[in-house]
Amino acid sequence: MKKHLIATTLIASFFTLASAEEIMVSAAASLTNAFTDIAKNYEKAHPEDKVMLNFAGSGALLQQMENGAPVDIFASADQVTMDKAIEKKLVKADTRKTFVQNTLVVIVSTDSKLDPKNLEDLTKADVTKIALANPASVPVGRYTKNVLEAAKLWQTLEPKFIETESVRQSLAYVAQNETDTGFVYGTDAAVLKKEVRVAFTVPTEQPITYPIALTTDSKKGSDRFYDYIFNADSQKILEDYGFTKPE
């Protein structure tokens, strides 16, 4: 009887290990805190799986996938980057879902004497350095450029821009007083409430929405974490970090 129980346990352990997965997730930098918490909860619920998180600007993540980086799930901070991923057949189009929405804001450090109220205020002489993520590869930079071009302020402000590789780098620059102001997402500003404050929210022509999808090479068990993103607990975590449901 004892030998039978041992054999049964070994067989069960074998099948658990056989179904275990190391799930590789590449996600926009602004999802860092929320996805880290969600992954921790997921691993508690699915101890057989290990979630590996990779955060960067959405364009940089896309390039990594093009270069052959192993990725199972891709979450970008804009629809344009996901469109490109689909065009290049890097993700499964039928798994694409928009799962959260964000806002664009201008921030200053909490000890700054600056108090800009609108985009025009950024043209004033006392604002000399503005952190802006690279519009060519980072969605927040692209959203910002579109807004400033529509307001006919891009060329005026361009000499003040200090280019960064991600929204989190822009956040750090302002928090450390390396720049006077910066364009980030509302959720990023909320992460460092003691170091930065929101000067004003920037209206965008289109809502800032985030899509997620399984990659074409995703492992069989990856859909477990993909589905987990949409459960009530995970959605509550995203909400707690300031994300809202898509309109």
Predicted feature residues:
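Gram-negative bacterial Sec-dependent N-terminal signal peptides
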Residues: M1-S19
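Exported/periplasmic ABC-transporter solute-binding proteins
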Residues: A20-A45, M52-F55, G59, Q63-N67, ...
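Exposed boundary/loop context
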Residues: S13, K50-M52
